[in-house]
Amino acid sequence: MPRVKGGTVTRARRKKTIKLAKGYFGSKHTLYKVAKQQVMKSGQYAYRDRRQKKREFRKLWIARINAAARQHDISYSRLMNGLKVAGIDVNRKMLSEIAISDEKAFAELVNQAKAALK
């Protein structure tokens, strides 16, 4: 019985890995062994960063809201507490967009939050 080496299967698997490594620097996009290691590491980075992206955006929204709130003489934490007490349910993403794009609407929200805290 002749030995079966699986040439087409091996070639297809290696070709797939090299295709995933497209755009990598140096030998990482040409040599199979190095490309395989880098593709695995890239997958780990992608998995980790999909979770970190959510944290980073939340931090960005909070920083924007805080900067806009302090222009109206109120801190971020007091603003958020005031909005909660006033019964205004708006998430941080939308609040940061309002702070950037519609200054008058944000000022009105700040006034309502201040009134609810008194």
Curated annotation (Swiss-Prot):
One of its GO terms (biological process) is translation. Keywords: Ribonucleoprotein, Ribosomal protein, RNA-binding, rRNA-binding. InterPro entries: Ribosomal_bL20 (IPR005813), RIBOSOMAL_L20_CS (IPR049946), Ribosomal_protein_bL20_C (IPR035566). It comes from Macrococcus caseolyticus (strain JCSC5402). Belongs to the bacterial ribosomal protein bL20 family. GO terms for molecular function: rRNA binding; structural constituent of ribosome. Binds directly to 23S ribosomal RNA and is necessary for the in vitro assembly process of the 50S ribosomal subunit. It is not involved in the protein synthesizing functions of that subunit. Gene3D superfamilies: 6.10.160.10, Ribosomal protein L20. The keyword Lipid metabolism does not apply. One of its GO terms (cellular component) is ribonucleoprotein complex. It comes from the Bacteria. This is Large ribosomal subunit protein bL20. Signal peptide: none annotated.
